[in-house]
């Protein structure tokens, strides 16, 4: 493995991938990001379908009615957690159910009924191990109990089990770390800092059929029909908890401006906005402007379009604390999204799109979240968004061939903010 001579090459026109001297999962497991997103996105553009970096989940209500949504998030935004969500107790008691069709990749095409249909081309989950535990994501952890490959985690030599940071508070005393060195949970480096046993990007590779909440449509050849597409990012103040786009092209605009703010203090740059359109920035196999145009053109072919939403679980108060509880309680936002898809609730128009009426977000059983909290989470700060519009303009300026439709959406946004 030579860092100086490391090549990951994709030749979309020839349907060829070459990976040399890499040991990074996404660049060596060539069926995953390299083929199923980079090459497949190019094939999809030419053949009239879409390869997207999206989870697919099913939501069943107490009447037994099932709806499916696809969702795209940049890394570190809880995509796998959402794909395997366990609803709050109050929802479970009523009979709501969440099923996972896929946690990472969706191949999407227009069905004969004019709806968008999505399949998960993968056979399992390639998940980040550190931080996965029975509280953060029980379904992911339970998926790893058999027929699972673990890479770069701690090996407990006493009972031949695995461990990683964030699994529990009991690291093994007689183990080897991800580099193969002896490790006992209390190793320090030359500066006296603790040495982690598992690599931060260590992984588990588990068959999807192991997952307790895997959908019975997981292997359906036609896939599942999408009622909604959800985009998301990590924003402290800008984006509200949830908003709905005004139409398909506006939804493509919302996806194209997806962003997260950097949180790692170690890099020294906190709060820097990193644009990651549709969470596909590392995976688009051709020109980004042409990719946006493909989304616009797909909209022209879909008779029964899914509605498009944006969510932000990461709004913070002035002390930097998250306001929304997240995790299983994100079900409450999915609930509203499905209600909007079925025209069961009204919404309030803002310069950026439609936000819920605060009373339409179910807060039953939430201790620290009141109607006023929800109102705060749904505010659209016009001055903040004027700055955001400048950032979007700058981002569009860095891309070639941005479709005129998206430039028009940006102009509309600016006009709405100045009304």
Question: Residue spans of the language-model regions?
Answer:
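Charged, amphipathic alpha-helical linker segments immediately N-terminal to NTP-binding catalytic cores
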Residues: 1-53
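Glycine- and acidic
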Residues: 19, 24, 36-42, 60-72, ...
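A short alpha/beta connector and helix-capping loop motif
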Residues: 113-125
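Short acidic-glycine loop/turn motifs at beta-strand connectors
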Residues: 60-64, 109-115
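Conserved NTP phosphate-binding and transfer environment spanning the P-loop NTPase/kinase superfamily
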Residues: 3-4, 128-133, 138-146, 150-419
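Pre-Walker A adenine-sensing motif
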Residues: 53-61
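Glycine-rich phosphate-binding P-loop
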Residues: 66-91
